[in-house]
Amino acid sequence: MNQEKIMQLEEIINTKYDNITGIIGLKNGVTKYENYFNGGNVNSTVHVASVTKSIISILIGIALDKGYIEKIDQKIIDFFPNYVIKNNNLAIQKITIRDMMTMTVPYKYQEDSYIKYFTSKDWVTFSLNLLGDCGEIGKFQYAPLIGPDILSGILVNTTGRSVFDFATEYLFTPLGIEVKDKITFSSEEEQVAFLKAKDINGWVIDSCGINAAGWGLTLSTGAKMCIRDRSIQHIY
């Protein structure tokens, strides 16, 4: 490897990116580079933000494989029989799991949506209420935080288990990964501290006990590499 380029990379990380704790680089399955930064080490667990969505997608795949979900093109509304559709929202009745996973669904976001989301007790219902009526199904619209929780709701309703327990049995434990706790916040300060921490191990849940699907999971650099390797094995 080009040592000059490596030194430049490390200098940039050490001076500009205090949220990076580790990098592992592989080529043909062989580790070519591994280093840790900003007080991190091989066991440091940090909030992986939107990587959580990829983990949820893997869990949806496992649920499909095990027969909990029949097919990826099922309508999401079918998994929430008690949800009351508001204002004759036709779009929400057409949206599928595939649409959710590919982020090609319309949302009715407003400026204060995030404050209301974080202070609401039921993130799944909150997300369902924002679906449809604005935009078109099939057009990409990135969902930073609000929305993916619907997939968590589907996993809970189909498996009869928490996302945390389902993931622990079928993904984390088989790979030797330990996600310890279900995390809740009692204040904004606690949430901000979580986003910056390098030693918190767990997965955020709402007041209903549903794991966040668009954010909220912590993993170590090694754990992410392990999941990456297993995913590639299944693809090829």
PLM features: what roles do these ranges have?
Residues 10-40, 72:
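A short, well-structured edge-of-sheet supersecondary motif
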Residues 29, 47-72, 100, 151-155:
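Active-site SXXK
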Residues 42, 110-188, 210, 215-219:
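Catalytic-site signature segments of enzymes, centered on catalytic residues
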Residues 47-49, 79, 83-137:
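Extended ligand-binding groove/face enriched in aromatic
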Residues 51-57, 94, 144-148, 221-224:
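Short alpha-helical patches at coil-to-helix transitions and adjacent helical residues
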Residues 66-105, 157-210:
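Active-site helix/loop module of the DD-peptidase/beta-lactamase fold
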Residues 225-229:
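Conserved small/polar residues in nucleotide/adenosyl-binding loops
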Residues 230-236:
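Acidic, glycine-rich loop-and-strand cores that form catalytic or ligand-binding grooves
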